[in-house]
Amino acid sequence: MSTRNVMITDLDQPDPNQQQHHQNPKKNRKVLQTLSGNFNRRSRSVEVEVKRQDNLGVVHKDRKKDRSFNSLLQAKDQQLEQLVQRLATLHRYNDQFAKENDQLRKDSGQLERRLTEAEQQVANCSRCQQLGQRLDTVLAQNRTLAGDVDMLKTLVFRLNVQIESYQDQRRLGEGAPTCGGSTKVSSSSAPYPPLPTHTLGPLLQAYDESLRDKDALLAQYNTEFEHFTGELKRALEENTKLLQSQEQLRRDLGGWREERVCLQAQLGVCRSKAEAQTRKTDLAKEKLVEVMHCYEQRMQTLILDMDHLQAAYARTKSELAALKSASSAAPAAVAPPVPAESEALHQCKALLEQLRQEHARERTCLQEQLQATTARAASLVRSTEKAKHSRDRLKARLRMALQWAQKLEAGQAEVRDTYEAVRRLEVLVQHKESQLRGLHARNAEEMDKLRHKLQQKEETICALLRGKMERRPAVD
């Protein structure tokens, strides 16, 4: 057999970096001379056994590595499922918080409407207007009565003056002499006409009765005025209390609005964090898929290289057997030809060693990538823990908000007890509640659609990973 019939592939080409280690064979080993090349005097069964053990060791290492990689992939899948479950719970809690926020917003709107109604009722109080009108009428009557009293006082003063003058005239008339003083009396009593006593008594009695009636009216007006002032004071006190409660409710509503704004901002931050976490998980999944693709391509190239090496090894083995059989018939004194076959065998060994080193390097690279993915998973776990802590803080703040809502409900009960006219707003509230139910239903449908899309994405990713894992044993 000549050297022209030997097929030399790219795997049989020598490596300039590793050829130097195999150019100096051992001096004590005897070299047989053949037509196509030289080969060492070594048992073929021993070489086959060593080669088989090496192949078995490589196969066992590959299987162990595949098992470890499969276990790592399963662990990553479990971690991704846990992260998806946590994200689902986070979305559920966010929905609950949104519902509670809408409920509290609705309650605050009802309180504002009731406060406006109360203010309008206080401004348009018919009883207060009636009391004011009655007070005006009573004051006018009081002024008229004061004028009548002044007039009666002047009349009584005049009557008293006339009575005194009449008494003086009677006293003078009784003390004067009857005979000689008739002319003086007539002359002195001429400017004063005689007082009719039968008309003065009834007039005085009528004035006394009118005075008593006026006094009774004044006493009645005083009592009514005192009663009105007491009612006015009570109304003013109730008005001040209502104004204070209104101011307190406004302050509480202002604090609740600020708290609601803070909660909305924190909810937006949590949603952005959740979106960032989902994007990170998607990137991690994509990188895992890329690593799997690279690993499969490397394994395919290694399998092809091993097939080429086995074919070359079989060819060299058959050629060595043929040369060994032909060496018995060849003369012993033939000059040693060029050791081409031994060099090809050394090149194959060097190439195999190089492939092993490349395989080891690729394995280390894959291990580093797996460590990087584990570090990313740990960072994802830490970020989920941070999200959980933020969710706990939101729960605490929402508990505080619920306490404020309970206080507001207590204020509502007080306002409801004081003002019963709030029942007229029930129809409007029912209409608003129907609108809110429609909005909640629409929001729930949108959230269900988003969850369905997320589930479809997760199912496709899991199906891709399972397909890759199922193709892996088939390739092995």
Curated annotation (Swiss-Prot):
Its main location: cytoplasm. Keywords: Cytoplasm, Mitochondrion. Transmembrane segments: none annotated. The keyword Mitochondrion applies. Disruption phenotype: RNAi-mediated knockdown of the protein causes complete lethality at a late pupal stage. Muscle-specific knockdown is lethal under strongly induced conditions, but shows no obvious alteration in locomotion and behavior under mild induction conditions. Neuron-specific knockdown flies show striking motor defects. Analysis of synaptic and subsynaptic organization at larval neuromuscular junction shows normal overall synapse morphology, but a highly significant decrease in the amount of active zones, i.e. presynaptic microdomains of neurotransmitter release. One of its GO terms (biological process) is mitochondrial cytochrome c oxidase assembly. One of its GO terms (cellular component) is synapse. The keyword Cytoplasm applies. It comes from the Eukaryota. Residues 1-29, 172-193 are annotated as: Disordered. Residues 180-190 have a biased composition (Polar residues). PANTHER family: CENTROSOMAL PROTEIN OF 89 KDA. Required for mitochondrial complex IV activity. May be involved in non-associative learning. This is Protein Cep89 homolog. It comes from Drosophila melanogaster (Fruit fly).
